[in-house]
């Protein structure tokens, strides 16, 4: 069962990774699609907010493995992760 959960997490992360796109010449990342799953907080090490030039707001969560996952900044779990990361900075 743990193997299935791990495989599902990898699949979700891969799908979320494909939801970031570069905009403009300054290589700013924008979120086209947000992850539909709450990523376990223990995997998140940093975050960045997308540029105001992006079509919609987003938070790019950085995982321990260096993957970037787009998340909805209005979700409570995303706001909690950001708050916790700021406290531990």
Curated annotation (Swiss-Prot):
One of its GO terms (molecular function) is chemokine activity. Induction: Specifically induced in macrophages by IL4/interleukin-4, IL13/interleukin-13, and IL10/interleukin-10. Expression is inhibited by IFNG/IFN-gamma while glucocorticoids exert a slightly positive synergistic effect in combination with IL4/interleukin-4. Strongly induced in several human cell lines, including monocytic U-937 cells, by phorbol myristate acetate (PMA). Induced in PBMC by staphylococcal enterotoxins SEA and SEB. It is found in: Secreted. One of its GO terms (biological process) is immune response. PANTHER family: C-C MOTIF CHEMOKINE 18, SMALL INDUCIBLE CYTOKINE A. Chemotactic factor that attracts lymphocytes but not monocytes or granulocytes. May be involved in B-cell migration into B-cell follicles in lymph nodes. Attracts naive T-lymphocytes toward dendritic cells and activated macrophages in lymph nodes, has chemotactic activity for naive T-cells, CD4+ and CD8+ T-cells and thus may play a role in both humoral and cell-mediated immunity responses. This is C-C motif chemokine 18. It comes from Homo sapiens (Human).
